[in-house]
């Protein structure tokens, strides 16, 4: 538990005008801290030095009140501090203070300096080239996107309200996807209305595309839609109930084969013939879709972040599509049968359909279990829990962003064709560290940061509304967003009245509670209640904002693929290395249990389940870490069954790494910058297949490295179940 000395009381009679135009109460403690920080760099802070510093602070405050009794600007305070230091002949202290202040001013300028940003990219700064583990920074189209991104980020920071830009640069908040927005009025992620587009046709480029007459054509069209949608937004795209969407086109294949059979096949064999041919068509079509998605590159310089939801279909075409999706994933990609990273597979469990032994689709659940033990996907949704948490059933947009239940003007439930307008994440651990163990101070700073986040989110909405249908025809004019607008119509009609969501993100509840209650707080009811109060307070606020602005503000448990690194790195610079908080070099995602500890899967789920229930239902996922499960799928089934009534969305993390030199299969060992075969030491991405859960999606960290903080977090994970992490030990490799 961190205990810090009592801090000075802010002066409520004097206001400070910040660089971004905000007015805040003058706080003497900030001057005191700045001088102590400078002193620690240039001298031993003895009791005598403490007394000198105290006297200096008194003089500075007296001078400020004398010259600026009503209000003072930041630069005026800094000038007085420098003058008093020089007057007192504290030259070393003055030099350090001035150097630090100048450096801060320089850092602020660099963030909006396009030339500096391009320089970082050309020098392959890790924070730039590895920010997104799905982007291969060695290839030309990604390099072009990264170049455009640093330009967009620099311009975007200048477009943001000053106090929002300042809070982002300091690390108080994170305005996500600055490389795309607000420079362009793009949307984030969505559930594509594939059903409407396939039924009614659409247009891409110069081609008018009619409704498909076969499942092969349908999946080909879907891959083209995905490529175009992913190039028109910056977040992930999902297909909800893809088995049910594609089944009518598989039935067209069946009817065609049945008609052909009338000419060539005996009457009693015609249906069998048509069904066998249709099964092959379904398999080939779904295999083509998997390969298409994994070979697509969008204008964003990456494979589209794509998720396929399935599992609720019951007729034979729907069931066959479900089985094909799973069998194709089990088989793997290419001659080496590598694990496909995309699309993310999301299988729905439902009581009475596939959950229990004896239910109609229980056999497909068994296939899903086999697939998860071998390829980690599918993740699973608990149908009834998703309805409870979000108001209706749907798959997440991208990896974890959930729409809330919504009905149109005719009272019809609508999910596909809806979208998210962006995310702003608050750095909760920083608030805890700044509060120095004072809970009242925590809530005071928390309130201030929530106000900034509100302004940032409202700006996201307003900027997105400035798009025109012509900016993204596939989204607004040709059906991906569910309605087909004219070129001059307002896109806001697809966003307002809570049709779209806008997300308030958060990170690091573990670290927050650690500041106040110590690092083993998980079984402390007071500590857990405190973390739940944070979620409840955020929930209260987003409901008020939704009522005020007319858009659905939701709480989002941020994936933090690179933010886990950025926030922790900035806070290490600000507060130093603090045990169990910044010394780990990463912050824990959202409400997740400390990854370094090993509760059972059941204990972990029981601990985490209350956070989405408390309000974090706009985006969430739970994981459990397992040993090799391929010989024990029943162990995984026990967790899935236990989770069904407790959590809505569950992922499987299990060792599936492979070395093609020595044939080792299991868990690779973390190295300083990646992973290596524990048998022969091989780390060549050409001859290994390393698959780790990066955040909501899987990643291949040897082929596409991730930022340092995420790598540290993955390396720190421990298993939640006993068992071997080796499937095949591998043989000796002679050089």
Predicted features, each with a name:
Residues 2-121, 711-712, 716-717:
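Charged, amphipathic alpha-helical regulatory modules used
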Residues 36, 429-433, 512-515:
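Short connector loops/turns at beta-strand edges and beta->alpha or beta->beta junctions
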Residues 47-48, 539-547, 719-735:
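Short, intrinsically disordered, low-complexity segments enriched in Ser/Thr and Pro
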Residues 103-107, 113-498, 519-520, 524-686, ...:
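Conserved catalytic cores of very large enzyme subunits
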Residues 244, 502-515, 536, 693:
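Contiguous, well-ordered alpha-helical segments that form the cores/surfaces of helical PPI scaffolds
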Residues 282-286, 290, 515, 707-715:
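Metallocofactor- and cofactor-centric catalytic cores in central/energy metabolism, strongly enriched
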Residues 681-733:
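Long insertion/accessory domains within large nucleic-acid-processing enzymes
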């Amino acid at each position: 538990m961190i205990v810090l000395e009592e801090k000075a009381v802010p002066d409520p009679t004097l206001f400070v005008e910040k660089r971004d135009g905000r007015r805040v109460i003058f706080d003497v403690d900030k001057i005191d801290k700045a001088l102590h920080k400078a002193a620690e760099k240039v001298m031993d802070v003895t009791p005598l030095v403490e007394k000198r510093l105290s006297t200096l602070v008194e003089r500075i405050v007296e001078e400020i009140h004398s010259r600026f009794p009503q209000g003072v600007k930041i630069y005026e305070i800094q000038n007085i501090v420098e003058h008093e230091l020089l007057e007192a002949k504290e030259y070393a202290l003055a030099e350090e203070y001035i150097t630090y202040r100048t450096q801060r001013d320089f850092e602020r300028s660099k963030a909006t300096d396009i030339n500096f940003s391009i320089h970082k990219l050309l020098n392959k700064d890790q924070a730039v080239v590895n920010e997104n583990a799905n982007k291969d920074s060695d290839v030309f189209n990604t390099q072009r996107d990264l170049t455009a991104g640093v330009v967009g980020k620099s311009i975007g920071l200048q477009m943001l309200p000053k106090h929002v830009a300042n809070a982002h640069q300091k690390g108080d908040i994170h305005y996500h996807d600055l490389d795309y927005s607000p420079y362009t009025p793009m949307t984030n992620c969505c559930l594509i209305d594939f059903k409407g587009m396939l039924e009614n046709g659409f247009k891409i480029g110069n081609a008018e595309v009619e409704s498909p007459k076969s499942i092969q054509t349908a999946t080909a069209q879907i891959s083209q839609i995905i490529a175009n949608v992913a190039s028109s937004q910056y977040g992930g795209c999902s297909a909800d109930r893809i088995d049910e969407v594609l089944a009518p086109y598989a039935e067209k294949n069946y009817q065609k084969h049945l008609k052909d059979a009338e000419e060539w096949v005996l009457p009693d064999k015609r249906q069998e013939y048509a069904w066998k041919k249709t099964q092959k068509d379904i398999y080939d079509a779904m295999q083509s879709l998997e390969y298409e998605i994994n070979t697509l590159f969008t204008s964003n310089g990456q494979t589209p972040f794509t998720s396929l939801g399935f599992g609720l279909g019951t007729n034979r075409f729907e069931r066959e599509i479900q089985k094909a999706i799973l069998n194709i994933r089990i088989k793997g990609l290419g001659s080496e049968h590598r694990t496909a990273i995309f699309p993310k597979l999301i299988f729905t469990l439902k009581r009475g359909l596939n959950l229990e032994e004896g239910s109609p689709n229980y056999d497909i659940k068994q296939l899903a279990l086999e697939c998860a033990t071998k390829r980690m996907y599918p993740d699973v949704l608990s149908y009834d829990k998703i309805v409870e948490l979000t108001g209706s059933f749907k798959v997440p947009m991208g990896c974890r962003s959930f729409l809330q239940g919504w009905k149109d003007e005719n009272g019809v439930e609508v999910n596909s064709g809806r979208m998210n307008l962006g995310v702003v994440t608050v750095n909760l651990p920083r608030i805890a560290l700044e509060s120095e163990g004072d809970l009242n101070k925590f809530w005071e700073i928390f309130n201030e940061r929530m106000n900034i986040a509100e302004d940032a989110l409202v700006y996201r909405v307003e900027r997105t509304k400035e798009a025109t249908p012509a900016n993204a025809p596939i989204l607004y004019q040709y059906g991906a967003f569910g309605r087909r607008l004219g070129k001059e119509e307002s896109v806001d009609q697809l966003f307002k009245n809570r049709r779209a969501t806008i997300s308030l993100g958060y990170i690091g509840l573990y670290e927050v509670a650690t500041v106040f209650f110590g690092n083993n707080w998980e079984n402390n009811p007071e500590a857990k209640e405190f973390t739940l109060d944070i979620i409840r307070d955020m929930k209260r606020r987003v409901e008020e904002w939704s009522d005020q602005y007319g858009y659905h503000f939701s709480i989002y448990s941020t994936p933090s693929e690179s933010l886990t690194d950025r926030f922790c790195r900035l806070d290490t610079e600000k507060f130093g290395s603090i045990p169990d908080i910044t010394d780990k070099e990463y912050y824990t995602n959202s409400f997740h249990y400390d990854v370094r500890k090993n509760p059972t899967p059941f204990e972990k789920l029981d601990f985490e389940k209350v956070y989405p229930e408390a309000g974090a239902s706009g985006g969430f996922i739970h994981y459990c870490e397992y040993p090799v499960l391929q010989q024990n799928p029943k162990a995984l089934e026990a967790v899935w069954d236990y989770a069904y009534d407790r959590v809505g969305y569950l992922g499987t993390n299990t060792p599936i790494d492979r070395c093609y030199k020595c044939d080792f299969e299991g868990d690779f060992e973390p190295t300083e910058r990646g992973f290596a075969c524990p048998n022969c030491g091989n780390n060549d991405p050409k001859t290994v297949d390393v698959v780790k859960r990066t955040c909501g999606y899987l990643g291949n960290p040897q082929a596409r490295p991730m930022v340092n903080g995420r790598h540290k977090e993955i390396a720190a994970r421990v298993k939640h179940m006993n068992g071997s992490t080796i499937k095949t030990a591998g043989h000796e490799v002679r050089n």
